[in-house]
Swiss-Prot record:
Location of this chain's protein in the cell: Cell membrane; Early endosome membrane
Name of the featured protein: Dyslexia-associated protein KIAA0319 homolog
One annotated GO biological process: negative regulation of axon extension involved in regeneration
Alphabetized InterPro entries for the sequence: Ig-like_fold (IPR013783), KIAA0319-like (IPR029865), KIAA0319-like_C (IPR056502), MANSC_dom (IPR013980), MANSC_N (IPR011106), PKD/Chitinase_dom (IPR022409), PKD_dom_sf (IPR035986)
Residue numbers on the Extracellular membrane side: 23-964
UniProt xrefs under CDD domains: PKD (cd00146)
Amino acid sequence: MVSPPGVLSSLLLLAAMAGGSSQQCSEGRTYSDAIISPNLESIRIMRVSHTFSVGDCTAACCDLPSCDLAWWFEGSCYLVNCMRPENCEPRTTGPIRSYLTFVRRPVQRSGQLLDYGDMMLGRGSPSGAWGDSLEDLRKDLPFLGKDGGPEETAEYSDDYKELERGLLQPSNQQDPRGSAEYPDWSLLPSSDGDFNASATGDNSAASTEKLQDLTPYPLDQEQLQSLNESTWSPTPRHSEMSSMWPSSVTASPTEEGLEGEETLQLQEQPNNSSGKKVPMPSHNPSPASLESSPTTVEKSSIFTVTPWSRDPGTPTFPASTVLPGLISPSWPLSPTTSRTVKALAVSAGDNLVLTLPNGEAELKASVEPAPPADTAYTYEWSLMSHPVDFQGKIKQENKPTLHLSQLSVGLYAFRVAVSGENAFGEGYVNVTVMPAARINQPPVAIVSPQIQELSLPLTSALIDGSQSTDDAEIVSYHWEEVDGPFLGEAFLDDSPLLRLSNLDPGNYTFRLTITDSDGATNSTTAALIIRGSLDYPPVANAGPNQTITLPQNTIILNGNQSSDDHQIVLYEWFPDPGGESKEMVMQGAQTPYLHLSELQEGEYTFQLMVTDSSGQQSTALVTLTVQAENNQAPVAVAGPDKELVFPVQSAMLDGSRSSDDHGIVCYRWEHIRGPSAVEMENVDKAIATVTGLQVGTYHFRLTVRDQQGLSSTSTLTVAVKKENNSPPRAQAGGRHVLMLPNNSITLDGSRSTDDRGIVSYLWIRDGQSPAAGDIIGSSDNGAALQLTNLVEGVYTFHLLVTDSQGASDSDTAIVEVLPDPKKDGMVELILQVGVEQLTEQQKETLVRQLAVLLNVLDSDVKVLKIQAHTDVSTVIVFYVQSGSPFKVLRAADVARNLHKRLSKEKGAFLLFKVLRIDTAGCLLKCSGHGHCDPITKRCICSQLWMENLLQRYMWDGESNCEWSVFYVAALALTLTVLTGAVTWVCICCCRRRKRTKIRKKTKYTILDNMDEQERMELRPKYGIKHRSTEHNSSLMVSESEFESDQDTLFSQERMERGVLKGSLNGSARSGVSFGYYSKDR
């Protein structure tokens, strides 16, 4: 139950507050021919248009919250928010028209007294856009220097200093009178926590406006509500009267208190012999204020209390909100005796204003007078109010200093109570934490629609720019015509909406330029097409959405599905302006196909704009998603362990063999343990250097990390030993024998030994070894030498090993490569088919067909190699075996047999056309007088020897070198001579036969009675003897074969011959022979 005096004092306080709320803003002190010297970086000045007198300027300042000073300068009005006293200090100047008028506002006085500077900072700027830019102020006020103040001015030293001391800077000692006067402007906080603000209007709205003033940048409604809720805790607040005062305190509102000013109530103690007065703050807001404003501090009523009274009717006060680490105030009270308490002058320091990210502060209390020499004061700090989301740290040690950290945005009120022997005092301090300074973002101009198409008879259009955005406020819109039929300025209106009418056919382009409250601008354009005839717009089709996964970072977007009723004349690709901006490479941006490369992880949006022959356009969007590939953890490789020989004191730590699927971004070397400290260089690189090594074993750890944060570690050991080195012993592996077709081998030199370890291996091919044969990789620098493609012959390799001290040793390895025992049986079959087109199934079919042709089993045909011969032919090397045990058939016989069998087949028996069948190797002996060409498979004979042409072309056709050139030449010469002789004889015989005519043989008849004259020898004409006359001794009558000649011989004596003939005939009949005389010739 509350006592009647307490109820009466509460009613009086409410009446005083209600009376003060109705008082209006009034004019304060005025200075003529004076200016101020502000710092333009920490003051807010706004120029007001359409003011005609000093009174109008002062009225404008009264109407604007947080305006402290009305400045009339050369016919222009400027409203000033001082923020700090030195910013509004008047200075005299020359005879110019300049008047400074400070305004007075009715406020209620709070017990949490703040000095002027902190109150100005706490007020901030008014809600909305407040203050002109520095460039505009310097143009309007050219006399301001670089620091924002006048270049040469004098100060109003007396009256403004008196104003500052008496009015602007309240003293820590409270005015003992019932009220205080504030002639120029009120500097103390009102009951709702604001400073120098009008008490009229809705308290909730005023609270929101004040919170905006405390914020360096405009807040939206949600942020304001959050800040209001966090400014004052909804829990019951600490009452400034929560402690039992050691003297009687009575609430006595004065006339000034009834006019709206809340005063400090002080009353002398009747039994206090010292005569000092104890300040008693009054914190009683009106009930309406408590109910309507969420930021209003809850305070208890003030009661008349008898010191140390234990009457059950005496009211008790609510405890203050004390956070962990703070001690609730407790007062040493004696229940039986009454003592005189000495009042201490306690100051908690100036009110603080912090701006995030600075959230730390230190409060320090000072007391006057100082404690006696042998005693000390007791300090108790308590948190009176704090934001709801307060989670800061308070370091309380019952000392004069209080440490604060991790403070959030809002207002904090602290109270410190200092007590000593028969002495007590308390002080208050406010800490205001403001949000971080706002960074202005330029506005974004948005027009809707961007492209608008109309067809006659429609000639009116509307373009909406109200969707433009800004982080603060857009203050102006400006439209202008960029292209198209001229409209004139009458059609353009500087408003968010552009209304157009009576438009002529054509293409129009309008630009919208917007300006925000900070002067930043942005512009965009809108296109308007007025068509005279009906033409349907094109339909853009950018294709379906695409998704790719890294490492693939290229793709082609296809827009050729776009259509139009006439013709599309232009394709345009560009990233969607509303999407995220990522780096990429675009090619073919004005073609139907957009080539994209160097894409990164994320989502891309592209817009395709197509334009038809009449200029109509259409757009379509396509989304491309680039997904990250699965990331694997890196693999750290610190390298092999090292052994060093003292006095070597440094080593290289090589981690460059560490790997990751996306690349390693971070290396870090650490010295884990060892016999002594070492110095390391480049510990964040792949290769580090360590120095200062001593004899012993050191352990180092390498940690690698990839782009996604995955890491891996590896450990390296470095052993430093004393010098005692023996040369190494090389072992190359001895002699090895290979038999073709096996043409690969590994020579193992790892059995080489050294007392400290071999650091390098080097394999060297002997100069007399065949040049053919390949070394795989860089194995010639390793312990094992890997060889392949060896040919028939003997290879010699020398192994050279070296230890860490440079000592070396060598050894030799021999590799003998023997010919293939199946070499004589390998057949080469060339088919007209590309090697890439021959399948395994087709190969098996070919094997079966060859087995049929050769009359063997499928398993007897062994395919050794299949390789390309040309781009359109393939070589198959195989051999044929038969019998048990298996015996390889001669390649020449197999090839000859295949030739015969294939030549008998009418059609193509094999799957593919056969281009050639031959032995794989050149197997001809060449009769021991030449060698076989491995390419042409023919004998190349030695000098003086040649091929047996008969065998080559008439018999088996095998190339050979059987004939000697000498024998062939002699035989050819002999044949030539014989042929010539026979030919000459034949010619001669033919000529003689043509000159000689053969006579008929003469028939002779033996005559019995022939005289001596008649027995003369008959000779042929021209003296040629007849053979019959040489052998016949008797005369015979003959009929000459040359009757014609006889007729010719005896033609002259025809008559005589006729007589003779008659006689002869008669004689013949009678057996008498004829005679032949020479004279008859």
